[in-house]
């Protein structure tokens, strides 16, 4: 393997989400969110009891955002992208089919999903479950469909979900049952020999083609961005890429900086099979699938990410710290320049932790390891089970995210809301406790709730206590604590080396000197030296990545973060 020479050193101060530091803003608590989105994810009707939602699509219609996702038994609507109302749906017989898509056309919302025999439904008032079937004349079998309406009101239909077949597209006539106009065109072929991120496997290591799927089209400044997902929904490296062209049916060219939506690191990974949309203020967002995939390949959640669409640097979603608290703007924001993070650091990672009880293999240490694929489980689901974290010293706590794991449950759809009741208390000495969060009378199904404190709490100890007898185990993927740790900021990362594999140019290996006083590291990369559009969190001092383009030149940098600062100003940039 060939060691790469250092090209240039740069200084950059960054925020959590975007690439520039923002001034402090006053944000109402109900506009502060994190990922995964806190929804009443439905338990599935068969196999091991687990929740699922994936393959989301979202459109703004008559003053509300409507979001549909696979296997959810209904859909959600929101006025602000922060608070969501669930609408159960029984009038769409194909609601259980995978990968839904929706279209705003005139004063009506249209719906369809994956099917060998396409059936389309419409509703002018989707706040009510009153959908009607369209006399559909679209005759091609399809999976992972997507509608796109152009500025001239012409409508196009895209689909594709295969490790062999291409992404397809055709114009349709919505006034004539969505009859196809002309013959479908093959738009995106498989190219895993050139594009490492299309290769399947946890680390893109399997010697076969992945699945190209989940198309979506965005038009920006007269150009058409045809998005697609790869290589498989069960992987953290599941992402969305772009081809771009001047016409809705191509020809399209591959965007070198792909994938544009990508999140292999952090508490929860995955950012694929998504949908890019514009909010009512003109801001772009990407809603996508995130993976757990332990009890079933399709055990998934949804994530929401801000998107930059830059004339110079292309399109890229800001995902790295999108599972830390951030705020939903109520105005137009330049995500390339303005940071929407709350600036709260993770305080709970691998701190001393204890519990009332635990099952073997589900120890309390798994509840603050920043891995959604592992969890703590108490021996029972009885009231009185608890989990406690010692932060090591008194720190300022701003928010706590509770991520329930539903372990040993026997819940299957259809089911009543699964409601947790609990409280969280804090202490400076482990003896005298103050209640910070009271959910003892909670009636909402909120498995990933972010509790933002009205007044920051200065505590060393935090304890969550179950107050409701439940089946199975009281269990948590992670209890995540955010705030200000105080102390020294991280030093500059030293010894950073990037090596490209001589036999497979899609593979890079990175090493650097371990640093003291750090929580983790941020690896950044891109195909343009002045703008590294991708980044991920790494906790060790070495990393192998196989998701690069074979024929592209890349630039890299490495920085560190801790409980005091999430991005340091020293970054070293390397070229290959």
Predicted regions and their residues:
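Aromatic, loop-rich ligand-recognition surfaces of beta-strand-rich domains
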Residues: 369-437, 447-495
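Hydrophobic core positions of the immunoglobulin-like beta-sandwich fold
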Residues: 389, 452-453, 512, 543-547
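Extracellular low-complexity, O-glycosylation-prone stalks/linkers
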Residues: 425-426, 514-540
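Pro/Thr/Ser/Gly-rich low-complexity, intrinsically disordered linker/stalk tracts
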Residues: 482-517, 550, 564-576
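Beta-strand-rich modules
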Residues: 545-566
């Amino acid at each position: 393997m060939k060691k790469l020479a250092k090209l240039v050193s740069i200084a950059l101060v960054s925020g959590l989400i975007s690439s520039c530091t923002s001034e402090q803003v006053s944000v109402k608590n109900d506009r502060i969110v994190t990922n995964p989105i806190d929804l009443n994810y439905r338990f599935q009707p068969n196999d091991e009891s687990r929740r699922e939602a994936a393959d989301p699509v979202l459109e703004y219609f008559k003053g509300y955002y409507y979001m549909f996702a696979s296997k959810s038994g209904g859909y959600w609507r929101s006025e602000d992208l922060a608070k969501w109302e669930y609408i159960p749906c029984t009038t769409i017989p194909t609601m259980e089919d995978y990968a839904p898509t929706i279209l705003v056309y005139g004063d009506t919302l249209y719906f369809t999903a994956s099917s060998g025999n396409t059936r389309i439904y419409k509703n002018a008032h989707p706040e009510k479950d009153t959908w009607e079937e369209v006399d559909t004349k679209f005759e091609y079998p399809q999976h992972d469909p997507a509608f796109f309406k152009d500025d001239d009101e012409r409508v196009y239909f895209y689909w594709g979900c295969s490790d062999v077949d291409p992404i397809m597209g055709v114009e349709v006539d919505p006034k004539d049952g969505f009859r196809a106009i002309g013959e479908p065109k093959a738009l995106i072929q498989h190219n895993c020999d050139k594009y490492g991120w299309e290769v399947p496997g946890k680390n893109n290591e399997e010697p076969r083609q992945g699945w190209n799927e989940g198309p979506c089209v965005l038009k920006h400044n007269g150009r058409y961005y045809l998005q697609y997902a790869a290589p498989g929904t069960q992987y953290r490296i599941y992402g969305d890429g772009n081809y771009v062209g001047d016409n809705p049916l191509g020809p399209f060219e591959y965007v070198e900086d792909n994938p544009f939506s990508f999140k292999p690191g952090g508490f929860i990974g995955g950012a694929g099979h998504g949908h890019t949309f514009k909010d009512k203020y003109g801001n772009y967002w990407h809603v996508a699938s995130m993976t757990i995939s332990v009890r079933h390949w399709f055990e998934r959640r949804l994530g929401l990410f801000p998107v930059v669409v830059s004339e110079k640097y292309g399109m890229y979603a800001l995902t790295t710290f999108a599972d830390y608290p951030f705020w939903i703007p109520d105005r137009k924001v330049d995500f390339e320049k303005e940071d929407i993070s709350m600036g709260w650091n993770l305080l709970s990672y691998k701190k001393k932790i204890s519990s009332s009880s635990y099952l073997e293999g589900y120890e309390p240490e798994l509840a603050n390891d920043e891995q959604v694929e592992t969890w703590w489980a108490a021996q029972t689901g009885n009231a009185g089970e608890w989990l406690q974290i010692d932060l090591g010293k008194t720190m300022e706590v701003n928010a706590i995210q509770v991520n329930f794991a539903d372990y040993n449950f026997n819940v299957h759809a259809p089911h009543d809301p699964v409601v947790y009741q609990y409280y969280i208390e804090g202490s400076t000495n482990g003896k005298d406790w103050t209640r910070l969060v009271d959910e003892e009378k909670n009636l909402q199904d909120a498995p990933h709730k972010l509790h933002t404190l009205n007044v920051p709490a200065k505590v060393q100890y935090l304890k969550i206590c179950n107050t409701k007898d439940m089946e199975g185990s009281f269990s948590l993927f992670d209890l995540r604590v955010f705030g200000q740790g105080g102390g020294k900021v991280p030093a500059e990362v030293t010894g950073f080396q990037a090596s490209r594999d001589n036999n497979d140019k899609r593979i890079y290996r990175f090493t650097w000197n371990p640093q003291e006083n750090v929580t983790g590291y941020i690896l950044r990369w891109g195909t343009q030296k002045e703008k590294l559009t991708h980044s991920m969190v790494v906790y060790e001092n070495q990393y192998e990545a196989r998701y690069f383009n074979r024929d592209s030149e890349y630039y890299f940098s490495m920085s560190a973060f801790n409980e005091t600062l999430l991005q340091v100003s020293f970054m070293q940039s390397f070229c290959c």
